[in-house]
A protein has these predicted regions:
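Short glycine/serine/threonine-rich phosphate/pyrophosphate-binding segments
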Residues: 43-49
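Periplasmic peptidoglycan-binding/anchoring modules of Gram-negative envelope and division proteins
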Residues: 142
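Nucleotide/phosphate-binding catalytic cleft detector across ATP-hydrolyzing
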Residues: 1-38, 51-137, 145-163, 170-198, ...
């Protein structure tokens, strides 16, 4: 049991996890805790947060109930409509998505062996996986635009150049590049999205950093 807690938005923790303290004095280093927009794509929600050098307020955040689970459902529906006799569990769908996920110009061959009426059958689900994953693109782009409208004009360009995707959904190959496309086509010419190599552990690393440095009076004591 814990005798104290501190509730912090996951995207802010991700920014802390991405921050490289040893490089803060480098002239060309952009501190992700000062000018960034973090997109955390989880299972149930996609959480986005402006990180501008201070603890984010509710106005700095947006949350959409469209994420990994929604991609799974869409993929399962597409496969079942095309091959209604296939045996397809939720676990199998998730595994197929995680193995073959891609978006945009990133293409993957996805010929898989599934069972129909007790017999093995090889089907090609490449386009279905890609199209299902791409449902996240307009959601993320809309969230980014909504948050940019809340920024000071001086902050828009540096934040737009530092859009960071993390969470399990950011593993979708080609997703960060595809999110840039609708933004740039609508005039956000400086839009730059990226997925850090250690995207899966950023939140955990950030949580440890904060836990080690938080003051005693900042902890929340549960009743």
């Amino acid at each position: 049991l814990f005798d104290r807690v501190l509730v912090i938005p996951e995207p802010f923790l991700a920014a802390m996890g991405l921050r490289e303290e040893a490089r803060l004095s480098d002239s060309g280093y952009v501190d992700p805790t000062r000018h960034s927009l973090i997109v955390d794509i989880g299972a149930g929600t996609t959480d986005m947060c402006l990180v501008q050098g201070y603890y984010p307020t509710p106005d700095d955040q947006v949350c959409y109930p469209v994420a990994g689970d929604a991609v799974d459902k869409t993929l399962a529906d597409r496969i079942r409509r095309r091959w209604p006799d296939l045996v397809l569990s939720r676990v199998t769908v998730t595994q197929l998505k995680e193995r073959y996920s891609c978006a945009g110009s990133a293409r993957r061959e996805a010929k898989v062996r599934l069972f129909a009426d007790g017999k093995p059958r090889v089907i090609d689900i490449a386009d279905m996986v890609r199209e299902s994953c791409e449902m996240l693109v307009p959601v993320i782009a809309d969230g980014i635009k909504a948050l940019l409208k809340r920024c000071d004009s001086d902050s828009v360009v540096p934040i737009l150049q530092n859009v960071i995707l993390c969470g399990g959904g950011s593993a979708i190959q080609g997703l960060s590049e595809m999110v840039q496309q609708p933004l740039r086509s609508e005039g956000y010419e400086d839009a730059t999205c990226r997925t850090p190599p250690d995207y899966r552990r950023l939140v955990a690393v950030g949580a440890v950093k904060i836990a080690e440095n938080v003051r005693d009076d900042q902890w929340q004591i549960p009743m």
